[in-house]
């Protein structure tokens, strides 16, 4: 957890009142932070305050005081002004940076901005340095992910450039040094420096070093190690140039957003920021000539439901109208949609808010954890999906089927080509998330190291066929089943753009019969445990005057599927809801050949969650 230094005089100035230490300690505790220590430097009182590691907006005095001020009810309407906020305006002011094609994936990205007319003094100077270092340590993972350089704008000859330069061509005077250092000697020069030696390993194996240079050829910084001495900021600096190089563009944008949003309170006009344009070379490996205007002050909107808020927070008497003043204390604006729904406008500097649960956490903090009425907790209640899974498992085991557990990852070729299938488009909004969807677009593994593990499975059948292939030499018939999760993408219909579903797959293989009758019998057996019967079984029992459940039932609907023999495959449809929750059939010989299987195979696969959701209505 990062700890920041807050001078009492800064606290008084920014909060607009003097708060005694005991009261401040209570406020911090309620807000979810802690006064770790109190130090004195002469007559100056300094609070050491520990803040959450994911709240990058609180790692500076400006952000912390702004948040506490709002929390105690002193609301301030902060409105940021982005000046020169277009590519044309930036080019006119020479506020742009060219990224050379030599810049590779080891430090691919750069984000920049300009702050002008900064009212600099000793406290502001120290706050800038501390904010920079806290972002380096936490967000930047000790400069591995990103490194920030803050320069005296007036000493720079714009525009600037970012490139990887040959070591022998690098010559500059580093920060707080008096002698010129060449790139060939750079590592040796700093290997005994107690503050910088731990960062040298980041670039020690680079053939070329990353540098940012101005139009006059002056090296401004050699990230992620050090800036030049010529552009260092002092108490007399009035204009700031901020640059952040990174291997993750999103994190670099977060860092620059935090710096600009916090330090712009010292600018004239207040909260004004000058935009900066970054243009990548057309041969740049990652960006291919893209251009970006920074900083990106873009809020995001989330829609929340009161049932979820009450369930997660435990505040059972909370109404939708109570939410707005609570979130206002946390500097988040909200809007009521109806009696059960509201939207929130998440500030761009709150990168920690990624899900509805983060909004609920802020509501609970504003409400006060001490004000939430405790309830007796029900311990060791079995999850309904787990209970359902266990029931299926027991039934199949009693029917002499052996359970297997296979990998959740596999190759695209196996999941689709070997099954003679093609997945649906990633932007297909017609996919019903409540149904059985083996053709849904898969979740892909980024930068997969092996072709065997490229995607997350969308069906259990593929790995079951691989398992049969590996065990075809054993005594026949083979009876296996697997209960496991599949995943597929959802195109903006869920907060993670993907969904997990619990599937059951049953496979039967024998030399003398395809086993479709056996598979059909197993389907009836497992669904009977849920009092779920087929339409023909209900009709048959009614003729015998035997009462069985008939309000919910399933029927087998013939279909065509290239993975199965024609006229030997059916959809399993849940009625009267008309939800397809599974498939049953005999695997096509071509598919069996693809998996090196030389005996007939029948399979069942069902979406357990579809059944469970309907029966629990």
Curated annotation (Swiss-Prot):
Pfam families (alphabetical): B3_4, B5, PhetRS_B1, tRNA_synthFbeta
Record key words, sorted: Aminoacyl-tRNA synthetase, ATP-binding, Cytoplasm, Ligase, Magnesium, Metal-binding, Nucleotide-binding, Protein biosynthesis
Reactions accelerated catalytically: tRNA(Phe) + L-phenylalanine + ATP = L-phenylalanyl-tRNA(Phe) + AMP + diphosphate + H(+)
Presence of keyword DNA repair: no
PROSITE patterns to which the protein is assigned, alphabetical: B5
Biological process (GO), any one: phenylalanyl-tRNA aminoacylation
Record: residues binding Mg(2+): 352, 358, 361-362
Record bears the keyword rRNA-binding: no
Gene3D superfamilies per record: 3.30.56.10, Bira Bifunctional Protein, Domain 2, Phenylalanyl-trna Synthetase, Chain B, domain 3
E.C. number(s) listed in UniProt: 6.1.1.20
InterPro entries named in the record: aa-tRNA-synth_II/BPL/LPL, B3/B4_tRNA-bd, DNA-bd_dom_put_sf, Phe-tRNA-ligase_IIc_bsu, Phe-tRNA-synth_IIc_bsu_arc_euk, Phe-tRNA_synthase-like_B3/B4, PheRS_beta_core, PhetRS_B1
The organism's place on the tree of life at top rank: Eukaryota
Compartments where found: Cytoplasm, Cytosol
GO CC annotations on file: cytoplasm; cytosol; phenylalanine-tRNA ligase complex
Cofactor(s) annotated in UniProt: Mg(2+)
Molecular function via GO: ATP binding; magnesium ion binding; phenylalanine-tRNA ligase activity; RNA binding
Known regulation of activity: Inhibited by bicyclic azetidine BRD1389, which competes for L-phenylalanine.
EC class name: ligase
SUPFAM superfamilies, alphabetized: Class II aaRS and biotin synthetases (SSF55681), PheT/TilS domain (SSF56037), Putative DNA-binding domain (SSF46955)
Ranges for domain B5: 297-374
Entry similarity comment: Belongs to the phenylalanyl-tRNA synthetase beta subunit family. Type 2 subfamily.
Quaternary assembly: Heterotetramer; dimer of two heterodimers formed by alpha and beta subunits.
Name of the protein described by the UniProt record: Phenylalanine--tRNA ligase beta subunit
Organism whose genome encodes this protein: Plasmodium vivax (strain Salvador I)
